[in-house]
Amino acid sequence: MSASSSSDSWLRRQSKRAARSLARRMRDFGQVEPAGFDLADVPSADIALYFPDGPPKLYQLTQWLPVFEGNNDVTTIVIVRQVDAFNALLGTTPLRVILVPQYEDLMALLDRANFGAVVYVNNGWTNFQALSFQRAVHIHVNHGESDKICMVSNQAKAYDKVFVAGQAAIDRHEAALAWFDQSHLVRVGRPQLDLEVNPALPLTERTTITYAPTWEGEDEANNYSSVDVYGVQIIQAMVDHPRSRIVYKPHPRVADSDDPAIRSQHRAIVAAGNEAASHDPAAGHCVLEDADMLAV
């Protein structure tokens, strides 16, 4: 047997092995039964708020929950696809939360519930399962805006409408995307700014300086984080500023980052902040990993 034939044979075996592994994963993905509803008694609602991922990304959904909770003109149901996210959400919102892991059940639910709109907070891969449903308007609202390259994903073309904060987002899409219909973009502002938010910190006469770094992204092209490069130096410079209160508010995905350098420097930043707080208790230095950024 030639080296080429041997190589081809090995590649075929590896391909089959990978295919079997993927098939098992896809099968296991649907092993959990639906929860929170019965297909024989499908809930009625105007809007389905769709969340495809697990607990580490729940911040993408929870920032939108108060917006829909406060709207008495329409009924909203939250659809989640993963059981750990479903369990984490139970008891945290007055909105009805239902678990639909399997594609067949999702299609049956969408068909019978007759939602007017399905709203997406990210570009999770199972979004495209829900997008196959024809009789609803599919709206992408994202989970914040910035000048990151991921804010102008080509996936925006998949949705009927993409809600954005303002003109900067429209300009961003126009500059980055080819053959994109700008009429799909709808300016809605930032609805969360209209909500009442309880302050996370007491008032102080000191100057409050907040360090709120982002995470490293899914790939290097989306890595805008300063945590592993300048984080400790930034905190130390803030501490050295006279009459200041230092607040460290990292992106929700910094603490459990897959990057060891990010995790290590995050811990070092927390340690530096705690040390500064112990040296000057009256300053009110603090680490706020779970607080709403609008409350800081």
Where are these predicted regions, by residue range?
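A short, charged/proline- and glycine-enriched loop
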Residues: L39-I47, Q134-R135, L203-T208
